[in-house]
Amino acid sequence: MKAQHLFFAGMLCLAGCIAIEPTTRIEFTAPDSYPEGVAYDSIGNNYYVSSARLGSVGKVSPDGKYSVLHADTTLKSTYGMKVHPDGKRLFVLAGDANYSKYTNPATRTKMIRLIGIDLATGKRLSDLDLSALVPGKHFGNDMAFDEKGNTYITDSYAHAIYKVSPDGTASVFAKDKMFETEGIGLNGIVYHPAGFLIVDNTNTGQLYKIDIANPQNVQKVTLDQFFVGADGLLLDSPTKLTVVVNGGNDKIYQLESEDNWKSAKLSASTLIADRFTYPSTATKYRNETWIMNAKFNELVDSNGVPSKTFAIQKAVLKPLPKSKEKGKD
């Protein structure tokens, strides 16, 4: 019996000593770029990535070849991006919120622009200044499209959501006291086909549901926990939402809702062993979820050496074990 116990103990030790490898990564070389946004283009079979340091927009092939699609230092930093529903344009948010190599007092926390780029040529097709919509500081962070082609944009410093119609008309869509917080507020945003937006707040970890037809109707989504450090969002299905969390946690979570997002519960997450490095945003490749590792933790280290390589990493969400019912083994 003693020998048997020792055998099983040895097997457990061996299993514990086997290192769990991180999930698949697409590594690419783009020195000092620090990409925050990522968007997959199913037509061109490429990923597009932004740059918080250089303000450029890059293209990454599935095998990790990087090339610059659009470069303009006046953009300062580029953040959230989405391939337009027409499949021909890439919409990108540009500003000077924090990490730009080209920052200056005239634009620092003042600039917020929505750029439209031709995917075929890399040329800029549109450039919309949103800074006059709300006075004060600005940080254009993320965006979502509805089924009519309207664009909804989060401004993390102005605590507002803007709406840009297909003809380029910009307006304040929603601004509520509940959005207000210190530091980075509203961030990730998705459109739900039932006719509402879901938005997260980085500093508070709260989610909000906002009615498209009545944007004054802002509701907190009841959660079983808060997701402080919440960044990008991705709607996987009408009942499932992926939340990217960074700032020390560096994990990806999936929430599920059974009541049309009045409330939601945590249902799955990635593993610590996946070792995401300041994950920021998510995109879909077929049925898979891929995450941009922004590495922003390096930008607050004054002694750090700027990275040359970055990675888009596959998120494998593991279902959480269901809690046992009371009174049952």
Please report, for each region that a protein language model flagged, where it lies by residue:
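A short beta-strand motif characteristic of beta-propeller blades
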Residues: 22-29, 65-71, 123-133, 171-181, ...
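Beta-rich, blade/repeat-based domains predominating
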Residues: 30-44, 52, 74-98, 131-151, ...
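Short loop/turn segments immediately following the C-termini of beta-strands
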Residues: 52, 95-97, 156-158, 202, ...
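Structural signal for beta-propeller blades
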Residues: 55-58, 99-100, 114, 159-162, ...
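Short loop/turn segments that connect beta-strands within beta-propeller blades
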Residues: 60-65, 118-123, 164-169, 211-216, ...
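Short, conserved, GDST-rich strand-edge loop motifs in beta-rich repeat architectures
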Residues: 93-109, 294-309
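Asp-box/WD-like beta-propeller blade repeats and closely related beta-sheet repeat scaffolds
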Residues: 105-148
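Beta-propeller blade signature
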Residues: 108-120, 255-258, 306-321
